[in-house]
From Swiss-Prot:
Pathway: Amino-acid biosynthesis; L-histidine biosynthesis; L-histidine from 5-phospho-alpha-D-ribose 1-diphosphate: step 5/9. Residues 3-211 form the Glutamine amidotransferase type-1 domain. IGPS catalyzes the conversion of PRFAR and glutamine to IGP, AICAR and glutamate. The HisH subunit catalyzes the hydrolysis of glutamine to glutamate and ammonia as part of the synthesis of IGP and AICAR. The resulting ammonia molecule is channeled to the active site of HisF. This is Imidazole glycerol phosphate synthase subunit HisH. It holds the Pfam family GATase. Transmembrane segments: none annotated. Keywords: Amino-acid biosynthesis, Cytoplasm, Glutamine amidotransferase, Histidine biosynthesis, Hydrolase, Lyase. Its main location: cytoplasm. InterPro entries: Class_I_gatase-like, GATASE, Imidazole-glycPsynth_HisH. Heterodimer of HisH and HisF. NCBIfam families: IMP_synth_hisH. PANTHER family: IMIDAZOLE GLYCEROL PHOSPHATE SYNTHASE SUBUNIT HISH. The keyword Amino-acid biosynthesis applies.
Length: 211
């Protein structure tokens, strides 16, 4: 079974991500060891919480360069929730620079009548890269589970793999570019749809191993 390293920097619910990966047919290992990231077949960066503590926690564990090296190597990489946001250059939530792997900023939802912030609960994706491996075997507008007050705004729109609409605001819900994928929602909390997305990621890992 493919070995998927789940990065532990004390900013995520790692147990439910690992459970989802096991169901998807992978062997998850929770780690912040550079060697284990290098040895793994794929890497997942989960995360819940605030932007500044997250990037500080990654940097204090010397994980910034290993993450960049992993992505540059072509190894399948998946960011989840805050793990998507910290791939960007900066966030309105904090003052720390992000990893800057994807050009763009993290912005806050604007208050408007009839919506709550955070955007919390089930919502439908609009797939802007419908042929992305992440969306294989999914219905056209799948329902997934969100909890966030901030969203990513990439400079290059072609990296956007899906959007979601909250009130009148349509924002990026996922990005995909070559081996780098990241989602704002929580696949591990998104029932069968989320499990299928994790299974699709694991399938890509298998293909990479076989190539």
């Amino acid at each position: 079974m493919p070995v998927v390293a789940v990065i532990d920097y004390e900013m995520g619910n790692l147990h439910s991500v690992c459970k989802g990966l096991e169901k998807a047919g992978a062997t998850p290992i929770i780690t912040h060891s550079h060697q284990e990231l290098t040895k793994a077949d794929a890497v997942i960066l989960p995360g819940v919480g605030a932007f500044d503590p997250a990037v500080q926690s990654l940097r204090s564990r010397d994980l910034e360069q290993p993450i960049k090296d992993t992505i540059a190597s072509g190894k399948p990489f998946l960011g989840i929730c805050l793990g998507l946001q910290i791939l960007f250059e900066s966030s309105a939530e904090g003052t720390q620079p992000g990893l800057g792997i994807i050009k763009g900023k993290v912005r806050r939802f604007i208050s408007e009548p009839g919506i709550t912030i955070p955007h919390m609960g089930w919502n439908q994706l609009e797939l802007t890269q419908p042929k992305s491996i992440l969306w294989e075997h999914l219905p056209p507008q799948p329902w997934v589970y969100f909890v966030h007050s901030y969203y990513v705004d990439p400079v290059e729109p072609q990296v956007r793999a899906a959007t979601v609409t909250h009130g009148t605001q349509t924002v990026t819900a996922a990005i995909a570019h070559e081996n780098l994928m990241a989602v704002q929602f929580h696949p591990e909390k998104s029932s069968n749809i989320g499990l299928q997305i994790l299974s699709n990621f694991v399938s890509q890992v298998r293909e990479k191993i076989a190539a």
